[in-house]
């Protein structure tokens, strides 16, 4: 029998959640997702040593070490990672808008347009890129504008049905509901252990998937943030799943039978809902898990963005010495 990874590929688009060039070349995912954490990790590998040198040299020509130049070099490096990944996968690469813009709709739109233009300068068209935005109200509204301009978006840090409903109304190309981080919250909050079937993260994604398919919503559901292969197997059949190299390797080594768990042909009828800003914010306020994990996720990505910029500043300083 073929591996569980190959069986999964037959029913779900497999995406690699990594900037590891060697892993992507070896595991052959359709798409890749990145975030500030992944970009930072990738830039510490030999594969991107030349990209770092090039970006620093470019930064020196822009006039040194101002905050604006440092931010521009950091952007250039994130695009370098994305461009390298785009050369290895046939599909899309997700690149994230700065986490510190998560509550600024217009700034997020401006940054997204800049990312798309930066990729185009490297010969990579917008059809190959997904703009990642946090699923705040402001991020979702930014996605609505960008989608109307033909810029496809990946709404990330999604932890609730309310976020999923708002993303659908914005006609987002894709959402990334987080599985493992939801599990983390419930384990810490309740002290309980969960099976793959009772895993609150799995239950959340299944609920969102059912709502979308029952209402003919075209937004792609891509489960993310997995803690174990059990969660992945429990979502087999989901539109897409973005998976770390370690878990992809584990699936590749397992030749057991993989059972399909999700199918658009097997959903329960569910009423279509609509949320204005007040209703969205109230729903989030009532969901402690979603509120806490969204805020935490933004803080963590913002922290890694600061770390990336600090690295850039040090490199620029060293180059000037």
Swiss-Prot record:
Record's keyword annotation contains Transport: no
Catalytic activity, EC: 2.2.1.2
Location in the cell: Cytoplasm
Pathway: Carbohydrate degradation; pentose phosphate pathway; D-glyceraldehyde 3-phosphate and beta-D-fructose 6-phosphate from D-ribose 5-phosphate and D-xylulose 5-phosphate (non-oxidative stage): step 2/3
Gene Ontology CC terms: cytosol
Entry keyword Transferase: yes
CDD domains: Transaldolase_TalAB
Active-site residue numbers: 132 (schiff-base intermediate with substrate)
Alphabetically ordered keywords of this record: Cytoplasm, Pentose shunt, Schiff base, Transferase
Pfam families associated with the record: TAL_FSA (PF00923)
Main location per the UniProt record: cytoplasm
Cited InterPro entries: Aldolase_TIM, TAL/FSA, Transaldolase_1, Transaldolase_AS
Catalytic activity annotation: D-sedoheptulose 7-phosphate + D-glyceraldehyde 3-phosphate = D-erythrose 4-phosphate + beta-D-fructose 6-phosphate
GO MF annotation: an example: transaldolase activity
UniProt GO BP: carbohydrate metabolic process; pentose-phosphate shunt
Role noted for this protein: Transaldolase is important for the balance of metabolites in the pentose-phosphate pathway.
PANTHER family, alphabetized: TRANSALDOLASE (PTHR10683:SF18)
Record family assignment: Belongs to the transaldolase family. Type 1 subfamily.
Stated name of the protein: Transaldolase
Species assigned in the record: Agrobacterium fabrum (strain C58 / ATCC 33970) (Agrobacterium tumefaciens (strain C58))
Lineage: Bacteria, Pseudomonadati, Pseudomonadota, Alphaproteobacteria, Hyphomicrobiales
